[in-house]
């Protein structure tokens, strides 16, 4: 019994440790081509660059939406991008697929490409991108287009032909289709089909109910192609990208007739030196700082609930009660299996989209157990052990549970705001979680999964589940609610805080403020599809085209 207790503790540690290390490429290192690095000519360190006094557009945040947005706007207008992080060559490890898990590990130093924090719900390991290209440079590379529900319910007046064209603009540069999948992924795909997650949709980027293999922003050699490469499509004469430039606040002018309008932004470099830069007539400041950064910048600049701002001694520019509200994160429910034989590390291109709303994704890893705690369980000289693991990740789509964001600091934007998502506060979300777990239960009974069972001394076969066991009765609401709340983790698919028809209008202009727009996931009330990065990059391109069309019409009227 003591031995089993030790093994259980070991397995629990392995679950945490190996999830953090579970994507490693088998491919050799290959350098970026010159064409892919053309955008480097546009990048300047903030402490080495003196900006012009004014630009047509200032994009705050060179992330997943900001890069395609800036590249598009630069076709006809001058654009300045202000990015708080460095570029990928300050963090060369983020380029390779084998380093993905390490990049997602909690990072606390101010120079890391990701910034970690814990939600007020007590869920740890949430991260914000802090690198040019944003979260597209530190994620797992899964690429899939948005779903119909998303497009019908965002409040944005989409032109679906333009949406399709914008997706294709992104995909021709960044997206790769896996030629094949690993043994584990093939087994999971077969199991999903066996339990009725139908039809088999093959290899597609579209969001379709059933089982499919999707795209990836990692190529066949294991190199990442993030949103930063979309800057290669820019007009280099019109675009300047400043890294290690942290925007502190937005400055407004005000008149009784027109209300507040953006005048300029204030930012500082890595040495703490402050700069101010303005916008030209008919220009805009566009926030693309993400679901945490964009509402945070509005709040520190005096746009938000007046009572909260006053309590922090922030001068109120515009009373906007919905800034920081409707914060949503899709809950993730994990099932981890120790496998009886070595497997090839795999990404996440296989997904099952169930008819009940939940999505099932998967990955596998073979992790060397060389952690600092090994000597505690295996006296020296302890043998190296490769732990093979298979994972199921269940995603609750379109959760109805929502929370809010508020400032920890009234002036220091380097401090991530407090955020509470209220995971599983609504019964609809618990039912989706229960559906995902019930699907796991069915999957474990399929022929496709038989090969992953262990045998005990009596010849009985069993799965070695690592972590909390699935409840015996998945139809019991209370036991499932407890299970879901105790096992919840993040899918990193945050949205909200500047939602449409609350903070911004259908054209993503901040209501009541002139010259200010928000273009990123903070305007969404649900995360698009199985993974938001495709739609977030599409949004940047889509809005860049739309803004130019608006501007051309406006200039033509003058």
From Swiss-Prot:
Lineage: Eukaryota, Viridiplantae, Streptophyta, Embryophyta, Tracheophyta
Recorded GO MF terms: flavin adenine dinucleotide binding; oxidoreductase activity, acting on CH-OH group of donors
Family matches, as Gene3D superfamilies: 3.30.410.40, FAD/NAD(P)-binding domain
Gene: NEC3
Assembly and oligomerization: Monomer.
Organism of provenance: Nesocodon mauritianus (Blue Mauritius bellflower)
Major enzyme class: oxidoreductase
Catalytic activity: (E)-sinapyl alcohol + O2 = (E)-sinapaldehyde + H2O2
Protein name, entry field: Sinalpyl alcohol oxidase Nec3
Active site: 493, 531
Enzyme Commission number(s) from the entry: 1.1.3.-
Family: Belongs to the GMC oxidoreductase family.
Role played: Involved in the production of blood-red nectar containing the alkaloid nesocodin and that serves as a visual attractant for pollinator visitation, including vertebrates such as Phelsuma geckos. The nectar is initially acidic and pale yellow, but slowly becomes alkaline before turning into red within 24 hours. Together with NEC1 and NEC2, facilitates the condensation of sinapaldehyde ((E)-3,5-dimethoxy-4-hydroxycinnamaldehyde) and proline to form nesocodin, a pigment with a stable imine bond. Catalyzes the conversion of sinapyl alcohol to sinapaldehyde.
Tissue-level expression: Confined to nectaries.
Glycosylated residues in this chain: 76, 180, 308, 386, 473
Pathway membership: Alkaloid biosynthesis
Domain of life: Eukaryota
Keywords from the UniProt entry: Disulfide bond, FAD, Flavoprotein, Glycoprotein, Oxidoreductase, Signal
Cofactor field: FAD
InterPro entries: FAD/NAD-bd_sf, GMC_Oxidoreductase-Related, GMC_OxRdtase, GMC_OxRdtase_N, GMC_OxRtase_C
Signal sequence, renumbered to the chain: 1-28
Binding site for FAD: 64-65, 83-84, 131, 135, 139-142, 247, 492-493, 532-533
Pfam families hit by this protein: GMC_oxred_C (PF05199), GMC_oxred_N (PF00732)
Disulfide bonds: 433-484
């Amino acid at each position: 019994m003591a031995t089993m207790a030790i093994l259980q503790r070991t397995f629990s540690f392995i679950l945490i440790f190996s999830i953090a290390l579970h994507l490693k490429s088998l491919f050799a290192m290959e350098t970026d081509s010159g064409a892919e690095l053309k955008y480097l000519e546009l990048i300047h360190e903030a402490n080495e660059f003196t900006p012009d006094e004014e630009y047509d557009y200032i994009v705050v945040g060179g992330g997943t939406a900001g890069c395609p947005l800036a590249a598009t706007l630069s076709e006809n207008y001058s654009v300045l991008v202000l990015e708080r992080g460095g570029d990928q060559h300050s963090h060369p490890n983020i380029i390779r697929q084998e380093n993905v898990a390490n990049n997602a590990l909690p990072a606390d130093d101010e120079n890391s490409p990701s910034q970690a924090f814990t939600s007020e719900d007590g869920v740890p390991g949430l991260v914000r991108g802090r690198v040019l290209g944003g979260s597209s440079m530190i994620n797992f590379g899964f690429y899939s287009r948005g779903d119909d529900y998303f497009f019908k319910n965002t409040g944005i007046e989409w032109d679906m032909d333009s949406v399709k064209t914008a997706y294709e603009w992104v995909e021709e540069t960044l997206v790769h289709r896996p030629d094949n999948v690993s043994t584990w992924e093939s087994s999971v795909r077969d199991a999903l089909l066996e339990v009725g997650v139908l039809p088999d949709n093959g290899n597609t980027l579209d969001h379709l109910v059933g089982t499919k293999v999707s795209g990836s922003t990692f190529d066949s050699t294991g190199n990442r192609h993030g949103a930063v490469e979309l800057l290669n499509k820019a007009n280099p004469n019109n675009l300047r990208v400043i890294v290690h430039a942290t925007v502190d606040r937005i400055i407004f002018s005000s008149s009784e007739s027109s209300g507040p309008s953006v005048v300029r932004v204030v930012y500082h470099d890595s040495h703490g030196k402050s700069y101010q830069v303005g916008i030209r007539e008919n220009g805009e400041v566009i926030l693309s700082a993400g679901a945490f950064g964009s509402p945070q910048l509005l709040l520190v600049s005096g746009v938000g609930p007046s009572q909260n701002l006053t309590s922090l001694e922030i001068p109120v520019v515009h009373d906007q009660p919905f800034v920081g509200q409707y914060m949503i994160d899709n809950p993730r429910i994990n099932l981890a299996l120790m496998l009886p034989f070595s497997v090839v590390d795999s990404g996440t291109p296989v997904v099952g989209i169930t008819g009940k709303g939940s999505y099932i994704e998967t990955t596998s890893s073979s992790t060397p157990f060389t952690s600092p705690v090994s000597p505690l369980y295996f006296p020296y000289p302890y043998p190296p052990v490769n732990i093979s693991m298979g994972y199921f990740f269940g995603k609750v789509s379109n959760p109805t549970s929502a929370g809010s964001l508020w400032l920890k600091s009234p002036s220091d934007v380097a401090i991530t705001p407090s955020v509470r998502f209220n995971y599983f506060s609504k019964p609809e979300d618990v039912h989706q979680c229960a559906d995902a777990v019930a699907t796991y239960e069915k999957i474990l009974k399929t022929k496709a999964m038989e090969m992953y069972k262990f045998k005990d001394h009596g010849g009985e076969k069993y799965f070695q589940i690592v972590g909390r066991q699935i409840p015996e009765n998945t139809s019991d609401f209370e036991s499932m609610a407890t299970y879901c709340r105790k096992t919840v983790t993040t899918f990193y698919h945050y949205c909200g805080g500047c939602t449409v028809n609350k903070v911004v209008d259908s054209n993503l202009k901040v209501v009541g403020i002139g010259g200010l727009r928000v273009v990123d996931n903070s305007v969404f009330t649900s995360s698009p599809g199985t993974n938001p990065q495709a739609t977030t990059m599409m949004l940047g391109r889509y809005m860049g085209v739309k803004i130019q069309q608006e501007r051309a019409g406006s200039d033509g009227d003058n």
